[in-house]
């Protein structure tokens, strides 16, 4: 019998203290070993509640932010999810534990391929990846029940929000003057309501597919 990783236990306690109350979200994070998504040189910090650098000048998000964003989506196992910014694949792997299927777009080829290898090793078969311009979403697969952005949009990401199904929820960091705010969007017919959740710090959402890397 494999004993629980004490680092994961400590992280779970930290997440609960930070406001993560959804047991399913907590379970998804517990079943997604973060050290598999962190560069080896940062392996000793994999279970610290902090963002860490990854390749291509990007980051793997702080576990608390991953958990709170996932919780804000109110996922169930029927949801079709769009993720903008695959990065290390950590957020997509957590989503895949809770949703029917995850479609994830990444502008960096290196990151997308590394994430795909991790998904395969973890036998996560309900994640579909694409290398491309995340600012355009994934219109060929729209509409989506849920949408999540893991990079901060300079303004409300209307092109992406157009791909949200009626009754759907999106969560995205958005630039506001000298700060970034995590915003939850909810579609009701042709109307989209906004709720500010918290201040955050993310890498910027960049237009286009990266020519190198």
Swiss-Prot record:
Disulfide feature: none
Keyword flag Transferase: yes
Pfam families, alphabetized: PCMT
EC number: 2.1.1.77
CDD domains, alphabetized: AdoMet_MTases
Record keywords: Cytoplasm, Methyltransferase, S-adenosyl-L-methionine, Transferase
PROSITE patterns: PCMT (PS01279)
Active-site residues per Swiss-Prot or TrEMBL entry: 61
Main subcellular localisation: cytoplasm
Subcellular location: Cytoplasm
One Gene Ontology term, aspect cellular component: cytoplasm
SUPFAM superfamilies: S-adenosyl-L-methionine-dependent methyltransferases
One annotated GO molecular function: protein-L-isoaspartate (D-aspartate) O-methyltransferase activity
GO biological process assignments: methylation; protein modification process; protein repair
Top-rank EC class of the record's enzyme: transferase
Similarity comment: family membership: Belongs to the methyltransferase superfamily. L-isoaspartyl/D-aspartyl protein methyltransferase family.
UniProt function note: Catalyzes the methyl esterification of L-isoaspartyl residues in peptides and proteins that result from spontaneous decomposition of normal L-aspartyl and L-asparaginyl residues. It plays a role in the repair and/or degradation of damaged proteins.
Matches recorded under HAMAP family: PIMT
Name of the protein this chain belongs to: Protein-L-isoaspartate O-methyltransferase
Biological source species: Maricaulis maris (strain MCS10) (Caulobacter maris)
